[in-house]
Design a protein with these regions (language model features):
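A short helix/loop element that forms part of the nucleotide-sugar donor recognition site in Leloir-type
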Residues: 5-18, 200
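Aromatic "clamp/platform" in nucleotide-sugar-dependent glycosyltransferases that forms part
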Residues: 84, 103
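Short hydrophobic beta-strand element within catalytic cores of glycosyltransferases
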Residues: 120-123, 133
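Conserved acidic donor-binding segment of nucleotide-sugar-dependent glycosyltransferases
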Residues: 135-136, 140-147, 156-161
Length: 206
């Protein structure tokens, strides 16, 4: 990104992956629907095959369980929980792959944001994700819960620099097709949905 100078970017990347490891990332509100444990299970399989690091960005009710799973797998040194972050584009700009194994996604905006930063996406085929993530081009789609399939696709993208670059370029190109005129209504829909759910919850509490 223009705000994040190349020298800063390389320094940041070197700090997180000192030996040139591939960097995978996940961003969410750490709720059950995000299937955060699947993120870790996918990464575990990737990590067995190649040097890699995982950045877990965000916070929520499933974070503690995710951290406990990391400890049980002895992967604390390779998985970093960064909490909520304001400069998302800066963090995404150093990632090589974005993992989104959600049970459901209305629009897949986090996947779109990753692609806009040039990060290919490994996701499920849930909800609106197939419209955002083009299978075999900007990343890959897998059935919900199929961590083996997701890991296989991840390794396919990460196996060599040329393949990774092809997916990165395609991700940026596809993200650009989502102009503001298309994105703003999606955000408005999302806010309307959240607001409606909140009002419904409040009415049930009364």
């Amino acid at each position: 990104t223009s705000r994040f100078h190349q020298t800063d970017k390389m320094h940041f990347k070197k700090m997180l992956a000192p030996n040139g490891e591939r960097i995978l990332a996940h961003v969410s509100n750490f709720r059950k629907v995000k299937r955060v444990e699947d993120v870790i299970r996918v990464f575990e399989r990737v990590h067995e095959q190649m040097p890699s690091k995982l950045l877990m960005i965000g916070d929520g009710p499933e974070r503690q369980n995710a951290e406990e799973l990391c400890r049980s797998l002895s992967m604390n040194n390779d998985i970093r929980f960064l909490g909520k972050q304001d400069q998302m584009d800066e963090i995404l700009s150093i990632a090589d792959l974005f993992l989104l194994p959600s049970q459901y996604e209305s629009f897949g905006l986090s996947a779109l944001e990753a692609m806009a930063s040039g990060v290919p996406v490994i996701s499920t085929n849930a909800g609106g994700l197939p419209e955002i993530n083009i299978h075999g081009k900007t990343g890959f789609l897998s059935p919900i819960g199929d961590v083996s399939d997701m890991a296989g696709h991840a390794l396919k993208i990460l196996q060599d620099d040329d393949t990774l670059q092809q997916f990165k370029d395609a991700a940026i190109t596809h993200a650009r097709t989502f102009e503001k005129s298309r994105i703003i209504p999606l955000y408005e829909q999302l806010y309307d949905t959240v607001l409606a759910e909140y009002r419904e919850k409040k009415s049930l509490e009364v």
